[in-house]
Amino acid sequence: MNFFSILGELLAQSGFAALTWRNCVMFLISFILLYMAIKKQYEPLLLLPIAFGMFLANLPLAGLMNEADHWYQSGVLRIMYMGVKSSLFPCLIFMAVGAMTDFGPLIANPVSLLLGAAAQFGIYVAFTLANATGLFTPGECAAIGIIGGADGPTAIYIANNLAPDLVAPIAVAAYSYMALIPLIQPPIMKLLTTKKERQIVMKQLRKVSKVEKVVFPVFVVLFCSLLLPSVAPLLGMLMLGNLFRESGVTGRLSDTAQNALCNICLLYT
């Protein structure tokens, strides 16, 4: 066996031989996202891990994401992805978000709850557009619609339940949309408001007592879970994190949820 035949065999077994245009397209998308994360600093904590994970997952013959194999033999990225597919990481992220959230302004001014209704507009627009294409089932359209709410963990959770085959693209689309909000939001704000309106200083809200802040997460979970049981996993973890924060007796758990746990989950999702 001469040198050239050995070289030919080596190349035939290398990733170059298995490289397709689809891999190249995904490489290009991942490089664009990396550029946006590093150069433009659009939500780098979200975009950079997503972009590089996308790059690694599309390396041909690398064995990092073999969906055909059993989960413990399917590559390190597939094993990490099981945490996303099982909704473990989205729920843990919600716990971290809850630990970082102060619901005091909402308790003091419940009318501000209506501001959250704006997210429903984006959800219905995305759902309608997906349904209009005729390419997706109603469940898949609903999962795609959640992207319009700009909420990555919720989009992943809903996709796991309604469109398991679309979890990966929906997750990437949702987090990319979240990362682009700093670019999308300013021109819309300037279009819909005047300069004088943007200079309005909000009045100081009433002081919210500790009892109210402790009772709030318990009441919300009880009421919403009885009204709509399917929201219990996400909402329960969100309010558990908030209870860590507001109880005043679990400082270490609150700090861990806000920092270490949140960062670990961001790495894996």
Predicted regions and their residues:
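Alpha-helical membrane segments and immediately flanking helix-loop junctions
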Residues: 82-87, 94-100, 115-125, 138-165, ...
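Structural signature of hydrophobic alpha-helical transmembrane segments
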Residues: 17-26, 79-93, 141-145, 230-236
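Transmembrane alpha-helix boundary signature
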Residues: 59-77, 100-106, 129-138
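Interfacial helix-loop-helix linkers and transmembrane-helix boundary segments
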Residues: 38-47, 66, 79-80, 100-115, ...
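Interfacial loop-to-helix junctions that mark the boundaries of transmembrane helices
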Residues: 15-20, 73-86, 167-172, 226-228, ...
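Conserved small/polar residues in nucleotide/adenosyl-binding loops
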Residues: 268-269
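N-terminal alpha-helical transmembrane segments of multi-pass membrane transport
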Residues: 1-72
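Membrane-embedded hairpin module used as a gating/binding unit in multi-pass transport
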Residues: 176-250
